[in-house]
Curated annotation (Swiss-Prot):
Organism superkingdom: Bacteria
Annotated family: Belongs to the UPF0386 family.
Pfam family of the protein (one): YjhX_toxin
HAMAP family registered for this protein in UniProt: UPF0386
Organism field: Ruegeria sp. (strain TM1040) (Silicibacter sp.)
Membrane-crossing segments per the record: none
Region annotation Disordered: where it falls in the sequence: 62-85
Name of the protein in its database record: UPF0386 protein TM1040_0419
Matches recorded under InterPro entries: YjhX_toxin
Amino acid sequence: MNISKNEQRVLHVLAQGGRILYERAPNGRVTEVTCYTREGLILANCKLDVFNKLRRKRLVESKSSRPYQISEKGRRSVRAQLDNR
């Protein structure tokens, strides 16, 4: 599966324990997303178009109206990368 660089960054943050909070319009559509790392920092690469691509590919999921997290398919798709800490 082809995953863009921005999608890969977001998936990597989610795989480390991050989450995506979202705002819905009255019609039920997601209008705004904010991606948080496990430390509570905001990831700037996580825009609405990147989120929609990840959701369309079923790489992120939300259960019981909770924040979006990485799905099992997303965990298998994300490429390993070094974490410079």
